[in-house]
């Protein structure tokens, strides 16, 4: 690397020295672009004010034919020396006899360059392997140091900044995981149920979860105790009611057993008038008694015109009938009475 940098400096300083512009370059070096004794600085010919401000035809041609050393450094990579460099030509160009006779010149700048080159030539040759010699012969395979430094800088900056930006953007733009969302939903349901339980339980000592659950358990125990007490009271009331109902049903049975004694005695009355006959019956109820009574009256020649019937406790019938004059002679009121008495299920004769 030291050898390549020294050769680059050497080429940059020696490019303007050509055969066609030898005299002009020497004059510019001694008077315009040489060593400044006042400021002790080197001003190369390419940075001269006259050279930059005033465009001469000869200088334009020279710049086109011989580009600057900085452009050469960027456009083409410097070749690496596999062996010792060849001996250098003398730096000072041959001067005419007239020029040397007229004045003497001192070149401390050129002497310093000669010392640098001599020190670089004394360095040992570079030892390479077989595969590396081919790569060294190809100048495009080894870019210049400036290009390498630029590429390394750009690569490192892009790598660090790009990856960090991507990671940050992924963290910012990414959605939460499914497990996190499920855990949030579970906690929300749990909090909602706790709030409902807190609203139901009348006595809450504290607002934390453990106290809410403890108070709810105590309240449930109190409710269960109340339910058990109410069930016991209901059983006691049921037993007392059953005894009371049994007493009532026993009294009703006794009443039903004594019912025939309480009923009135049967009554059958027949009242005849001019053309109408009135019939009044009161006896114990019997299935089909009404139908049999109506049929008996029709067989006796009595036609029912009006009738009032009651079956509330006893069977009672009050009817007004009409009969013909011929039947009055054949059937008496006593015959009608005895026929209705037998129809009611009584035996014997009605008094």
UniProtKB/Swiss-Prot annotation:
Source domain of life: Eukaryota
What are the recorded Gene Ontology BP terms?
gibberellin catabolic process; regulation of gibberellin biosynthetic process
Checking InterPro entries in the record gives: bHLH-TF_ACT-like_plant (IPR054502), bHLH_dom (IPR011598), HLH_DNA-bd_sf (IPR036638), TF_AMS/ICE1/BHLH6-like (IPR051358)
Q: Which GO terms describe its cellular component?
A: nucleus
Question: What tissues is it present in?
Answer: Broadly expressed.
A Pfam family matched by this chain, by name? HLH
| Main location (coarse class) | nucleus
Question: What is the annotated localization of this protein?
Answer: Nucleus
Give any GO molecular function from the UniProt entry: DNA binding
Key words of the record: Developmental protein, DNA-binding, Nucleus, Transcription, Transcription regulation
Q: Where is the bHLH domain?
A: 174-223
PANTHER family according to UniProt = TRANSCRIPTION FACTOR BHLH61-RELATED (PTHR31945:SF15), TRANSCRIPTION FACTOR SCREAM2-RELATED (PTHR31945)
Q: What is the protein's known function?
A: Transcription factor. May be involved in the differentiation of stomatal guard cells.
Describe the subunit structure: Homodimer. Interacts with FAMA.
Q: What is this protein called?
A: Transcription factor bHLH93
Please give the organism: Arabidopsis thaliana (Mouse-ear cress)
């Amino acid at each position: 690397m030291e050898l390549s940098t020294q050769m680059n400096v050497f080429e940059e300083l020696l490019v303007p020295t050509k055969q066609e512009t030898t005299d002009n370059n020497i004059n510019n070096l001694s008077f315009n672009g040489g060593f400044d004794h006042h400021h002790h600085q080197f001003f190369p010919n390419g940075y001269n004010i006259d050279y930059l401000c005033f465009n001469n035809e000869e200088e334009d041609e020279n710049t086109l034919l011989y580009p600057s050393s900085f452009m050469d450094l960027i456009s083409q990579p410097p070749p690496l020396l596999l062996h010792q460099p060849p001996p250098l030509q003398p730096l000072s160009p041959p001067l005419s006899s007239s020029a040397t006779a007229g004045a003497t010149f001192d070149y401390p700048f050129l002497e310093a360059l000669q010392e640098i080159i001599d020190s670089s030539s004394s360095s040992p040759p570079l030892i390479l392997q077989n595969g590396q010699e081919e790569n060294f012969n190809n100048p495009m395979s080894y870019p210049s140091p400036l290009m390498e430094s630029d590429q390394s800088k750009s690569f490192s900056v892009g790598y660090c900044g790009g990856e960090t930006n991507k990671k940050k953007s992924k963290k910012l733009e990414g959605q939460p995981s499914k497990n996190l969302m499920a855990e949030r939903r579970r906690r929300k349901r749990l909090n909602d149920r706790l709030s409902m339980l807190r609203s139901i339980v009348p006595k809450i000592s504290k607002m934390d979860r453990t106290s809410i659950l403890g108070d709810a358990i105590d309240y449930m125990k109190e409710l269960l105790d109340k339910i058990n007490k109410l069930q016991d009271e209901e059983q006691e009331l049921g037993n007392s009611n059953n005894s009371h109902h049994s007493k009532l049903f026993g009294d009703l049975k006794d009443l039903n057993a004594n019912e025939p004694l309480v009923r009135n005695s049967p009554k059958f009355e027949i009242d005849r008038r001019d053309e109408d006959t009135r019939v009044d019956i009161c006896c114990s109820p019997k299935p089909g008694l009404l139908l049999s009574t109506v049929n008996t009256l029709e067989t006796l020649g009595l036609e029912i015109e009006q009738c009032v019937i009651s079956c509330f406790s006893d069977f009672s019938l009050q009817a007004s009938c009409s009969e013909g004059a011929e039947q009055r002679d054949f059937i008496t009121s006593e015959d009608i009475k005895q026929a209705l008495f037998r129809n009611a299920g009584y035996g014997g004769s009605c008094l």
